[in-house]
């Protein structure tokens, strides 16, 4: 079986490429060209026939990933399945199943059955969890068990994986030599891999046997998302030498993976101050050959716990604007607790708004929906306005809960409604289209 990137290089427009082109209003040949170049990926494990086709990358609508998963403290398969269903209902594009407690195979399989979204994971979680259960010591992890586990997970139908290939002895040495890390290590999988390397004195097998990782991913046409295990967990650590060392390696691996016919994506931070986000995107795009960039937020302040879905949305709007391709949501529970169903819904909504704001800036020719919404608001055509809103159900419920006396207005202004008064003054004078320059 050939992967999407191999088919594209052979000049073949696959069914999945056709679907992405139709969904995004592109000529299929443009999609094929960008898939061939590694600028667009399409997670599409053939073992999962009910999966929604989603394109991620250059020129496409910025996509949203939402994550779920059990922990050692809270472990309910039913809860995670309900969260997965809620995430799909709210409009996320991809889902990561990141369980670390309970029957991990069962959680993954139930989630895969419950939704149609492309599903990914971090295989190191289960690898270290099961090793810890067996030996009471995660550092006893056998690399052969890890590779067997990756294939087992892929065979279930996972379409992308965050795999920490960029951590190696060199990146760890950079971290030790710089002598500081205000936020420590923020990646669970990355931290356990560093601990394994420290305990064994060996190189990271995911880096050392990178070709083997690519072979497994190619077998299932899954996207290899190069995880950032040394990412900054505090804005004061942003772009330190350790993070940059891993980023350089990941960007190099993205190129090597593409050469082997593997669909590749690079993961980004993390915690990044607002003034550094653009530079971060430029660096990844330049060094990776424009590989799709999967950004975890980013979170541009460290003091927003309880409202980090808002903190992250601000960073996500900026990173989307500057070229990020896939944004991982953050929920209000981030840094505090395992999220509830209500938390994941709120996280998707905040991120949905953030990427819309970012896409308006990234693609100025895609603002028509905003224009139509504005005109409907101006004319007090409430039913028409709802058709153009990101969250029509919320808008409808809020307005109905405090209904105005005049059905054309709302209770914010009542008799002082600027829209109503403006329509009385100007009637049809301001209802024409703007004349384009030079027309």
UniProtKB/Swiss-Prot annotation:
Cross-referenced InterPro entries: Cbl-dep_enz_cat, ThiC/Bza_core_dom, ThiC/BzaA/B
Co-factor binding comment: Binds 1 [4Fe-4S] cluster per subunit. The cluster is coordinated with 3 cysteines and an exchangeable S-adenosyl-L-methionine.
SUPFAM superfamilies linked: Cobalamin (vitamin B12)-dependent enzymes
Listed GO CC annotations: cytosol
Catalysed reactions, as listed in the record: 5-amino-1-(5-phospho-beta-D-ribosyl)imidazole + AH2 + S-adenosyl-L-methionine = 5-hydroxybenzimidazole + 5'-deoxyadenosine + formate + L-methionine + A + NH4(+) + phosphate + 2 H(+)
A GO term for molecular function: lyase activity
Binding-site residues for Zn(2+), renumbered to this chain: 271, 335
SS bonds (residue pairs): none
Keywords, in A-Z order: 4Fe-4S, Cobalamin biosynthesis, Iron, Iron-sulfur, Lyase, Metal-binding, S-adenosyl-L-methionine, Zinc
Superkingdom of origin: Bacteria
Family: Belongs to the ThiC family. 5-hydroxybenzimidazole synthase subfamily.
Function statement: Catalyzes the conversion of aminoimidazole ribotide (AIR) to 5-hydroxybenzimidazole (5-HBI) in a radical S-adenosyl-L-methionine (SAM)-dependent reaction. Is thus involved in the anaerobic biosynthesis of the benzimidazole lower axial ligand of the cobamide produced by D.autotrophicum.
GO terms, biological process: cobalamin biosynthetic process; thiamine biosynthetic process
Keyword Iron applies: yes
Cofactor(s) recorded in Swiss-Prot or TrEMBL: [4Fe-4S] cluster
Subunit structure: Homodimer.
Protein name: 5-hydroxybenzimidazole synthase
Enzyme class: lyase
UniProt: [4Fe-4S] cluster binding residues: 410, 413, 417
Positions that bind substrate: 96, 125, 164, 187-189, 228-231, 267, 294
Entry's EC annotation: 4.1.99.23
